[in-house]
Structure formats: C-alpha cells, structure tokens
C-alpha cells in the first residue's frame, strides 16, 4: 500500500470509528459491534473505500498482539501454574469436542474429510480480542467464569501451532523425510528467547529507565512487543503467544505498571482497527447468494459452542448464574480461522466457495456475540433484580435508599458494612454475578448489572437517594459514572474511589471533591504508628499525620499533571522542604507547652 493510500486509509479508519462507535454505544449494542459495522460500511462490499483488506487485516493483528502482552503482564509464572488444570483440562476439552462435532457436520455438508477437520478446528477457536474485550466490559475479569474463559483462550492460542502443522499433513504435501533439524532449530530459538528474556529484559529496562526520558521507555516497550511478535512469526508460531510470553517474563518486574501504561493507548486503537478489518472482510456477495446456508451455519456454530462450553462450565463447578455468560462470550469464531483457512486454501483443501462460506460464518458469529451478551445481561437482570422468591424480608426494607454503593470489591465492602452498621439504607450495584448471589444470601439489597446504564440507576433508587459512592475497579468506569450522575441525577452527592494521583486529578477536574485514594489513608495511618514506635508522642505523631495530609491535598489540587518528570521531582522536593519546616515549628511549640495526651489505642 502506497504512502498516500495508507494515509487515506488511516483517515477513513479514524472517521469510521469516531462516527460508528458513539452511535453504537448510544444504541446500546457496544463498541465492538460498532467497529464491525463501520468496517462493513467502508469495506469492499460496502461503500468500497478500501479494497486491500488482507494486508490491513494482517497489520491490525497487532491489536491482539498488544492485548496479549498486557494480559501477560498481569500473570506471573506461579499464577499460570495454578491455572494449568483449567488451561489443559477445560481448554483442551472445548477445542476437541467442538472441533469433532463441527467437523462431522461439515462432512454432512459435502466437505472432504480433510477440509472438514480443518474447518472444525478453525470454527472451534474463539476470538481472543473480542472475548477479552467483552469480559472486561461486563466485569468478568474478577469472576470465576472470567478466569476460566481466559484459560480456554490461552489453550486455543497454544493450539495454533499444531493446527497449522496439521494442514500440510492433511493435504498430503508433507515431505516424506521430515526435517527434524529445522524443528530442532525452532525449538532452540524458542528456548533462547525464554532464557534471554528471563535474564536480560529487566537489566535492559533498568538501563533505559535510568535515562529519565519517558519517550525512550515507550519506544523500548514497543520494540520489545513488535520484536517478540516478529520473532515468533518467523518461527511459524503465533505472534500473540510470543508477546504473551514476553509479558509473563516481565510480570514480576518493577516496570510492570509503566509498561502497561506505555502500551495501553496503542492497544486500544489497534484493537479497534482489527475489528474494523474483520467487518471489511465480510463478503456480502457470498452472504446474498447463500443466505440460508450462512444463517443456519451461524446459528449451529453458536449453539454447539455454547452447549459445549456450558457443559464444561458445569463439570468444572462454575455457578449456574455465570455459566451462560461464560458460554456466550466464547461462542463466536475467531481471528485464527482467517489464518488457518487461508493456509488450507493454499494447500487446495477447500472446493468452490467453501472457504468464503466459512469466513462469512466466522465474521457473522463474531457480530452476534455482543448482541447475545446484551440479551444474557437482560435475562440475568430480570432474574437477579426481580422480587425475592422466598418469604424472608431483605435487610433493607425501604425502597428509597439513602446511599447507592457501586462496586462490592474489597474497597466497597468496607464502606457498605460501615453504612449498614449505622442503619443507613443502602443499595449495592455489582457486575460480578458470584458476588451478587453471595450478597443476597446475607440480606443485602443488591442489583446486578452495569451501573453506567441510566435505567439500572433509576431502578436502584438514584432519583430518591442522597449520595452515591463509586468504588469501580476501572478508572474509565468511574469517570463515565460521574458524568452520568451529573447529567441525569444532579442532586446526588458524589463520593468516589481514586486508585492514584492521576485518577484524583481527573475527579477534581470533573468537579468531584469528595474522593479517597485507596492506599493513601492506610499508608498515613501506618506511618503515624511508625513515628510512635520511634519514640514520638502520639499527639505529635497525629498532628504530623494531619499536616502531611493537608499539604498533600493542597499539592494535589494545585499541581496540574505534568509530562516532565523533572517538574514533578522539583515540586515534590519543594513540598518536602515545606513539610520539614512545618514539623520543625511544631516540635518547638511542643517543647514550650505541656501536652496531656496519652496513647488511646
């Protein structure tokens, strides 16, 4: 693609995303489906603005690559070892069972048995990009079903390697004298990557971080991700698997959070590009010609995968309320099918329009997943938010709560327990189905669903409540909820959780003055106890704590987020000197007056 054409394509992608995604969000169908529809609109079968879909689709796989790197950063080797049963048990069972059933059906549809095997394996895979994005949107990351879903996706990525190796064997084009030397060299190169990454990555990033230039650190992070992807691609392995391993190798390093922050903006844009590219690849001509065949194929594919996943979730012990979410979020075909079917086509395994039909089926199945998840959410909301079926009265009898607590993680639990202990009428909103079921057993008045939906807030009593306490894990959800409350429920007194100074600045800029940084108060309290243990009088330690809190808050309100680390360091040094002067004056005052305080703990 020429430079001018590439620039034009970039402008079209951005325009399509900016136009389609907000519209999709307003219609309530989700950002992923918005990207897919945008791709259909600008692709060769829509308005025809872009025709070179294959090249763009290959480039857009970088979105999945960046996503897998961030996932790897969140998992250390010990955590992966804990997931071994679900990865190689449930994951393997899902691929084998789904592939066997789907291959049998393809043989009944006049596919050669070799093509049916490849088709069954390709259709058995799910979309890593779509599933992880939807799991994040639906708050499944912390749930048991979300962890199991990730394990299944990870096994599918591992299964890419033998699946691609199987294609030439099925086509009968494999060399009679298997090149063991080439295989051994690939294994050796993979081992070198693991060992080298284990012992070299941290010293390299330590050297780069010492330069103090943020842009160089970001460039080094991009270099690592793209190099790992290119290296694995050269070995004939999954690019996403390579970057996932690189992320795991750095999961226990001190640079984990900085690496994640550097990659996150690129991941979001490239994932959007990936979904747009998938939409562009939808062959509407084949769809029109074989409409009934394709429609039946999509339904059969989704139903078979959902039944398989639901059965495995039940055998694994997942709660009944979470099984439907788990089964539906992995029910689509995946991006790996494009690679596998293209490889099989080059080996002449498919006949006529068979490959085109399979690709259309995969693409449409990906489009059904957001709608299916939305339907599952509505069903769960009616089931979990309806009237109590038993005769026991809930702890909260008043339909008009004083406070709405959004999120019932460790942070939200403490707040809710304190409010309930003081006889406050509260309602809790939570997206984790397991947490909802547990809370209801203990008599909490709780609603399941996404708190960023206006109707759910109304059902929870937002129009009559006095305050809302936002304890979301994701800062994006917090800011979205703040804007929603300010627009639709301006009478609510908003109190929020901030994960750090960046989120605190965002809340202040949005007009929220009542917030708590999740580690700040506990760290201050432990610091006060440390001062007392070193011989400082409890009263003096308490005053030191209050001074520090007051000065830090003043800095927080007055310090605009700076891009320069040196400016931040300079401001911090000034604040430290000011704090030392305050403490010196306090100590002189303490010596002049007798203090009657005693330790009261």
From Swiss-Prot:
Gene Ontology CC entries for this record: plasma membrane
Protein name, UniProt field: Glutathione-regulated potassium-efflux system protein KefB
Protein family per UniProt: Belongs to the monovalent cation:proton antiporter 2 (CPA2) transporter (TC 2.A.37) family. KefB subfamily.
GO MF annotation list: glutathione-regulated potassium exporter activity
Principal subcellular localisation of the protein: membrane
Topology class, membrane: Multi-pass membrane protein
HAMAP family: K_H_efflux_KefB (MF_01412)
Taxon lineage: Bacteria, Pseudomonadati, Pseudomonadota, Gammaproteobacteria, Enterobacterales
């Amino acid at each position: 693609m020429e430079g001018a054409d590439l620039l034009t394509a970039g402008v079209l992608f951005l325009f399509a995303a900016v136009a389609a995604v907000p519209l999709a969000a307003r219609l309530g169908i989700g950002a992923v489906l918005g990207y897919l529809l945008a791709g259909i609109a600008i692709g060769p079968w829509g308005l025809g603005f872009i025709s070179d879909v294959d090249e763009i689709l290959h480039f857009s796989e970088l979105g999945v690559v960046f996503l897998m790197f961030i996932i790897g950063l969140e998992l250390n080797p010990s955590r992966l070892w804990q997931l071994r049963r679900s990865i190689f048990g449930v994951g393997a069972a899902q691929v084998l069972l789904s592939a066997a059933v789907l291959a049998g059906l393809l043989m009944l549809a006049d596919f050669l048995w070799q093509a049916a095997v490849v088709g069954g394996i390709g259709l058995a895979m799910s979309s890593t990009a779509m599933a992880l994005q939807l799991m994040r949107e639906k708050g499944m990351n912390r749930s048991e079903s979300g962890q199991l879903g990730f394990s299944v996706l990870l096994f599918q990525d591992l299964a890419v390697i033998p699946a691609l190796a199987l294609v030439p064997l099925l086509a009968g084009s494999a060399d009679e004298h298997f090149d063991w030397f080439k295989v051994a060299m690939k294994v050796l190169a993979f081992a070198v990557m693991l060992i080298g990454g284990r012992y070299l990555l941290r010293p390299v990033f330590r050297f780069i971080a010492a330069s103090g230039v943020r842009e160089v650190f970001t460039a080094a992070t991009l270099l690592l991700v793209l190099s790992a992807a290119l290296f694995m691609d050269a070995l004939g392995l999954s690019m996403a698997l390579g970057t996932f391993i690189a992320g795991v190798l750095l999961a226990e390093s001190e640079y984990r959070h900085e690496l994640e922050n550097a990659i996150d903006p690129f991941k979001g844009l490239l994932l959007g590009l990936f979904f747009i590219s998938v939409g562009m690849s939808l062959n509407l001509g084949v769809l029109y010609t074989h409409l009934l065949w394709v429609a039946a194929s999509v339904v059969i594919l989704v139903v078979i995968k959902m039944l398989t996943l639901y059965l495995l979730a039940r055998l694994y012990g997942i709660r009944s309320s979470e099984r439907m979410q788990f089964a539906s979020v992995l029910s689509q075909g995946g991006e790996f099918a494009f690679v596998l079917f293209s490889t099989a086509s080059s080996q002449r395994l498919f006949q006529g329009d068979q490959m085109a039909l399979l690709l259309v089926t995969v693409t449409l199945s990906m489009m059904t997943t957001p709608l299916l998840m939305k339907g599952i959410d509505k069903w769960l909301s009616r089931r979990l938010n309806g009237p109590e079926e038993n005769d026991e009265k809930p702890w909260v009898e008043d339909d008009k709560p004083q406070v709405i607590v959004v999120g019932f993680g460790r942070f939200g639990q403490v707040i809710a327990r304190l409010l309930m202990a003081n006889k406050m009428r509260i309602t809790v909103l939570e997206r984790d189905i397991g947490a909802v079921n547990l809370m209801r057993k203990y008599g909490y008045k709780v609603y399941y669903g996404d708190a960023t939906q206006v109707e759910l807030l109304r059902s929870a009593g937002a129009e009559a409540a006095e305050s809302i306490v936002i304890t979301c894990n994701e800062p994006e959800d917090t800011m979205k909820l703040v804007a929603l409350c300010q627009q639709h429920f301006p009478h609510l007194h908003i109190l929020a959780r901030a994960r750090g100074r960046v989120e605190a600045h965002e809340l202040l800029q949005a007009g929220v003055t009542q917030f708590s940084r999740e580690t700040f108060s506990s760290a201050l309290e432990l610091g006060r106890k440390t001062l007392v243990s070193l011989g400082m009088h409890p009263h003096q330690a308490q005053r030191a704590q209050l001074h520090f809190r007051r000065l830090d808050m003043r800095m927080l309100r007055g310090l605009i987020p700076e891009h320069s680390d040196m400016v931040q360091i300079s401001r911090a040094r000034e604040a430290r000197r000011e704090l030392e002067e305050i403490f010196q004056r306090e100590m002189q005052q303490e010596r002049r007056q007798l203090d009657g305080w005693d330790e009261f703990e």
